[in-house]
Amino acid sequence: MTSSPIFWLATSVVFGVYLTTLYPSVAGGDSGELIAESCHLGTAHPPGYPLFTLVSWGFTQMLGPLLGGTPAWRSNLLGAMFDTISAACVFLCVEEWLRPGPSQLVRFAAPAFARIAGAVAAMGLFALSPLIWMYASHAEVFAMNNALIGCIVFLSIRFGRTKSPRVAELGAFMCGLALTNQHTAILYEGE
């Protein structure tokens, strides 16, 4: 993880942008069903999205008195938080990929400024792309999927550099979590 103030500033800006475009209530698509099922720990249409339902239920119920708003707004806020995490993972992936070190992943060592500038640019392009931004504005399983896959990609890059068993174990755990959210995660985990 980075302690760079630029990382935290860029992450805050992305979250702020997402907050300004957040749906105030139920959006279209599966959003209404997912919000309703997470309010009473039900099962949405197949495959059911158990991780999303549990996390959304916990977020809306436990933080409800603190955050205020309707369960729909709180579920939409959760989507914005997940896509902010996925954008932060893009930053971390680019920074890690270009970092110099003993087990360097690329043939050149990018200077710190270029590494950070590239990470901010990649984060911004990802976060503000139309599809990512759309799913950050309302409750949908894709925002959580983006965050989980972003973590898996970052951990894969980190493992390529460090060969740490702890990173591999965390990556395996994240792979399992991703499969309980969205079945398309298998496409990232298959190799």
Can you name each region flagged by the protein language model?
Residues 98, 103, 109-113, 136, ...:
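Membrane-interface transmembrane helices that cradle and orient dolichyl/undecaprenyl
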Residues 1-17, 85, 95-96, 109-120:
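Start-transfer (signal-anchor) and selected internal transmembrane alpha helices
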Residues 41-69, 80-81, 88, 178, ...:
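Short hydrophobic/aromatic helix or loop-helix immediately within or flanking a transmembrane segment
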Residues 20, 65, 69-76, 101-112, ...:
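Aromatic- and kink-enriched transmembrane "portal" helix at the membrane-lumen/periplasm boundary
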Residues 37-41, 122-124, 167-181:
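Membrane-interface alpha helices of multi-pass inner-membrane proteins
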